Amino acid sequence: MGIYCNFSRCVAAERLLKRITKETVMEALEAILTRRCVRSFDPARIPSEDLVEKIAEAGTFAPSGMGRQAGLIIKLYNREYRDRFAALNAQIMGREDDPFYGAPLLFIVFADKRQATYLYDGALVMGNMMLAAHALGLGSCWVHRAREIFASDEGKKFMQDNGIEDFYEGIGFLALGYLAGEPRQATPRKAGFIREVR
């Protein structure tokens, strides 16, 4: 059986394994089991750039088909863009309230549609960032309709103005911020969620 990593990668993997303890494993599982979508943010509390960068970095380490890293993460601080995307999103939904739930900051995840697994790759980027946000004490919510918005003339102009190539497709918006109020309880898991074949 061959070893499919060069020396530096093997050393890095060995060091990582030494840092993994029972406590860190339990913390990771706890983050997965206690994360909730947040639909009420405190708009006055803006996450620090350090926290935002850690969350974005977690997204870059999401699995991807053949390791091709199809995802692209945009950290959106611009309030004018944020509010315009909120208006477009609400229009598509046929609603008038803020689809970003008052979140002061957005991530936008795109993925390279030339890659066969781009939808899955983009979804995994979103998932990694949601877990990282929760682990760092922040709330997040995946908001859909990025595909529709960035297929529109206005969305295409945003992409062009900000150097985002046209082979990228919108996967999702990630509303990010501090919770306003208490986190909600998890909905009970559905019966038959897990099945077994032997």
Predicted feature residues:
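Acidic, surface-exposed loops and disordered segments
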Residues: I3-C10, I20-R198
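Leucine-biased recognition of intrinsically disordered, low-complexity hydrophobic segments
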Residues: L16-L17
